[in-house]
Amino acid sequence: MQVLSCSTDSRFVHKIWQEQELSKMVGGGFPFPMLSDAGGRIGAVYGVYDEAAGVDVRGRFIIDPDGIIQAIEMLTPPVGRKVGESLRQLQAFQHVRKTKGAEVCPAGWELGKPILKVGPELVGRVWEVWKPDE
């Protein structure tokens, strides 16, 4: 797994953001590389670059080892993301990949919680296995 942050801000803005903001919000600072996409080329490839404003909108992508996008989330600038939900989804995608799709993770699934085993015996019986409130 590799996590990267990418924005149209310069590496100098990232440095100040890390030192003055993130280090106070996240113990030890942001633990992942921050990429500068000053021209918006990376953002344009992923459809998050706003050319008129010269910035990327908030986007999150989970890309599997084969380079296939498994999840996309795009938010307008005033709304932040929840890191825990991103981590939960990443763990779910990793689990499904590890089992080659023989096991799937239901909505709200968390590491260590029951999974669903794909097969005809599950049809019409999901409610017996999946208890979202537990």
Ranges and model annotations:
Residues 1-134:
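Chalcogenol-based redox active-site neighborhoods
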